[in-house]
Amino acid sequence: MSNKFKKILVTCALPYANGPIHIGHMLEHIQADIWVRYQRMRNNEVWFISSDDAHGTAIMLKSEKLGITPIKLIKKIKEEHIIDFSNFNISHDNYHSTHCVENLFLLRKIFLSLSEQKLINEKKIFQFYDNTKKMFLPDRFIKGTCPFCSSKNQNGDNCEICGSIYEPTDLVNPISVISNSVPILKNTTHLYFNLPLFTNMLNKWIHSGILEKSVAKKTEEWLKSGLKEWGISRDAPYFGFKIPKFDKKYFYVWLDAPVGYISAFKNFCTKNKKVDFNEFWKKESKCELYHFIGKDIIYFHTLFWPAILEASSYRKPNGIFVHGHLTINGLKLSKSRGFLIKASDWIKCFDSDSLRYYYASKLSNNINDIEINLEDFIQKINSDIVNKLVNLASRNASFIHKYFDGYLADSLGDCNLYQDFIDISKKIANFFENRQFSSVIRECMKLLDLANQYINQREPWKIKQDNFNKLHTICTVGINLFRLVVIFLKPIIPDLAKKTEYFLISDLTWKGIDKPLLSHKIKKFKKLYNRINHDKILQLSLLCK
């Protein structure tokens, strides 16, 4: 990694404001948060922004069902989302909502710019209409069979199985999600963004190194098959922002929501005058911008969104980091399908570091799905964190306080392990930089094996009183090796890192790894982490019913 100071803006896909955060959402926010925390440890200026996606038919219908206004619903949901993210130590610098004055202003500004450039076309089309509910059906309120791979129960705009994008009218055997009736086709008028005009620009952009190879390959397939104009409007009734000069037309959520990245940062800059909005979002910006997203929304972020940014004279992202779906026993977690584990239920059974660590042990920079197995989860946490990491501190700290009044020795003796760990830090830093968190975990476990082997071979518990200097040195080495590993894992397990800082009476910083703690007093060891019991699985399963 370059020593040059960087300015970085990081976003996650916006959670929808019609229900709770589940551990699938948390996968993405934990992945981004680990990367953000690492960048902060390297003294880069990093701003981590997210927001609730607060518009759409689903919110309108849910508020009607609850007998409250959409405004009250999204306010309540946002408060719940913020609590959930806080419980998992997601360090957002600002968490906003797309239902805000900043988003309204930016949407209208962008729409006016697109219109003036004649990039918006008005078309008469046939659209599915629910004759029972007397309303046009948005894409996500139509289910049917994918016209490309024949997967059943797919959305009206894209297939979660093969990733194909299509028109709702292409679906086989469509059904209205709202009334479960067969929709009819009805004439209406909509606005479309001229996406095909940006084909050459997008082709150059996706091959500029900003996408992982598998993501670039998938995007290239869509480009080769030909881009279509992109609908940016929806019919009333709808909860969202009205399109100026178009009666009963509203901005579609896939224009509204990504603009939320910009509006959330705009709101942040309003509250933090030292941060310059234009420095990060102007077209020629030297700052870095990264989007963390799931693989089901690649198309929107690698084609539609960069074209909108290009047309509106905003900068494009330096990278789009894509992760796979989260599965349990092979089934994808999905709020719309009712198969999920709420973050609020998880935190009642397990601490936040445990999920962060388990996710990190499976995360890399590819888009493979991530499988959750609760038995494996418990085994991994108890083995890695309790048996290897925390036990290393416990067994050495007891001698330090029993015989040396809590003070570490003044040297590490002739032990070369400390320098070996420092040498490995460059490799670990590279893994962090490239989001290969599972490799970070593997390297740290190798280091812990070496550290524990060092202690076991020297058997400090057998050393007699006439050789206390040797005992002092061995235990000081053990504590310092423990400290280094916790520094490496600090972005992943912040709660344990904080407890370790209290125990060691020392901040855990990346720049501090070159200087071991010598002639330094530490506190008496208190349990840093509790072993997880298997009865927690039953507790979680009961909460999820």
UniProtKB/Swiss-Prot annotation:
PROSITE patterns assigned: AA_TRNA_LIGASE_I
Main location: cytoplasm
CC terms in the record's Gene Ontology section: cytosol
Catalytic activity: tRNA(Met) + L-methionine + ATP = L-methionyl-tRNA(Met) + AMP + diphosphate
'HIGH' region (motif): residue ranges: 15-25
Motif 'KMSKS' region in this chain: 332-336
Cofactor(s) needed by this chain: Zn(2+)
Subcellular locations according to the entry: Cytoplasm
Keywords: Aminoacyl-tRNA synthetase, ATP-binding, Cytoplasm, Ligase, Metal-binding, Nucleotide-binding, Protein biosynthesis, Zinc
Residue numbers binding Zn(2+): C146, C149, C159, C162
UniProt xrefs under InterPro entries: aa-tRNA-synth_I_CS, Anticodon_Met, Met-tRNA_ligase_1, Met-tRNA_synth, Methionyl/Leucyl_tRNA_Synth, MetRS_core, MetRS_Zn, Rossmann-like_a/b/a_fold
Domain of life where this protein originates: Bacteria
Residue positions binding ATP: K335
Pfam families listed in its UniProt record: Anticodon_3, tRNA-synt_1g
GO MF annotation terms: ATP binding; metal ion binding; methionine-tRNA ligase activity
EC number annotated for this UniProt entry: 6.1.1.10
Oligomeric and partner information: Monomer.
PANTHER family: METHIONINE--TRNA LIGASE, METHIONINE--TRNA LIGASE, CYTOPLASMIC
Job of this protein: Is required not only for elongation of protein synthesis but also for the initiation of all mRNA translation through initiator tRNA(fMet) aminoacylation.
NCBIfam families: metG, PRK00133.1
HAMAP family named in the record: Met_tRNA_synth_type1
Protein name: Methionine--tRNA ligase
Source species taxonomy: Bacteria, Pseudomonadati, Pseudomonadota, Gammaproteobacteria, Enterobacterales
